[in-house]
């Protein structure tokens, strides 16, 4: 909460000046003015010449007020950020650090701006103005160096802690701000750019810093040297020199999208995850050796456990990798686990001729497409309801249109998919979800599989109080990044 002085203008508007953060000795902005309706405050909010702005006040921007982080699902290993006492959470709960010291300054002042979660852990990041660099926090499992610290001596973090290492404290981090933070199953990556650089400009590629850490036994970190795990984040200068705008991660492989629309892959290739048409692992990033990919400009990509989908500039989808569950194209029943496909076009004929694809996604054994008109489609395994289609209506190996709401016509704004759970935000600001809820990943009380979209009222209430701006779904838990309340 923030305190400051106020005066009333025209009996309707409050003028707030010189807002002070209670844990700071200096003004957040010496000449900061806010105009709010006077009916947002009551006498209990005001003491002498000070006032308290509470979380139910609407109409302020996230750059001026603090972000919040919430979690729900299974609390095993402390990955929810609430210690070991919280074994499960159904109603999303705000994550707070009780110790108010310099290490926790960024988290406690609400400056977290990126979140991610792997199989059994959570990571949060924000920019520390005093240290002039991005800082990272984490909780949960650390047996594969997912949380950077300990060098093998700390198996898990039961509570949220600051994650520091020689690389993260080096001068190379100075002035670099986080563009992307992402997790695979047990490995992670981030892209950092100078705050004054144009992230999509090839001329600035040498300014980027691309770090990878965690499990690295299959080469998924991109280092030429073999390490089973990588604690201190590896500075992948090969990717920095190429110029990368996005990274996506599967179970044990990584694919990077360059500024000029090309894909570079490294890691395991048991199912042709790397797209080269073979089963040879790669330790360092290499341009994918495939004519279809080289002939197309790729504008987005997403990796599932062992397959990938990529969106081209002409609104087509390319896909490759494991295909036992028909997530790339139809295969006969009983196809073996070793089934995989080379790079090929996904059949999108069920979409309208002028239906532009605006988002793609991939989870364990599934792929998803969201179009400009608000329709969402799924393909792949439906064993845990991941496709959002009743068993009797599900068609294997082709895109299934998912119907949201009682009439099936509610439009989708964006979606979040990972493992066996999907959550969508609709254009009218509501949340629906389907798939596995065995660990309350959907914030629903009943532990079961949901084959069709269910409205998620716990998330609706959270969104009403504090805007949900990002959700990271893991195997058995979820975390969300939330900003200011809606107007």
Swiss-Prot record:
Alphabetized Pfam families for the sequence: RCC1, RCC1_2
RCC1 repeat boundaries on the chain: 66-127, 207-259, 260-313, 373-426, 428-483
Key word Repeat present: yes
InterPro entries named in the record: Ran_GTPase-activating, RCC1/BLIP-II, Reg_chr_condens
Keyword tags: Repeat
Keyword Methyltransferase on entry: no
PANTHER family: REGULATOR OF CHROMOSOME CONDENSATION
Name of protein: RCC1 repeat-containing protein DDB_G0284033
